[in-house]
């Protein structure tokens, strides 16, 4: 399932969805909890990225993430956020 498919799903259920987390980091340590055994995996110094996690209310296991990466570590967080939101808007329009 590609990002456009996921965006379409998000749009279709947006009235039933919560935005779980929006991240906008130049450098980050990312923690991923594996659902099967509750192990916590730790990733250090990932590339700059912005992510938005969307999932239906009370159904965290159905969540999915949309990531946009940017290789320029000097970019301002606000600029990254604007870039992300503009890109997200364009992708949503493409789903029509």
Predicted features by range, described:
Residues 1-47, 60-65, 69-96:
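Negatively charged, low-complexity tracts enriched in Asp/Glu with abundant Ser/Thr
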Residues 48-56:
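Amphipathic beta-strand/beta-sheet edge segments enriched in Tyr/Trp
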């Amino acid at each position: 399932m590609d990002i456009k498919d996921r965006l379409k799903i998000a749009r279709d259920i947006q009235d039933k969805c919560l935005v779980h987390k929006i991240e906008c980091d130049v450098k980050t340590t990312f923690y991923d909890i594996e659902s099967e055994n509750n192990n916590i995996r730790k990733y250090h110094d990932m590339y700059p990225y912005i992510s938005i996690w969307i999932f239906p209310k009370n159904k965290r296991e159905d969540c999915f993430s949309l990531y946009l990466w940017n290789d320029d570590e000097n970019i301002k967080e606000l600029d990254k956020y604007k870039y992300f939101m503009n890109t997200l808007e364009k992708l949503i329009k493409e789903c029509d």
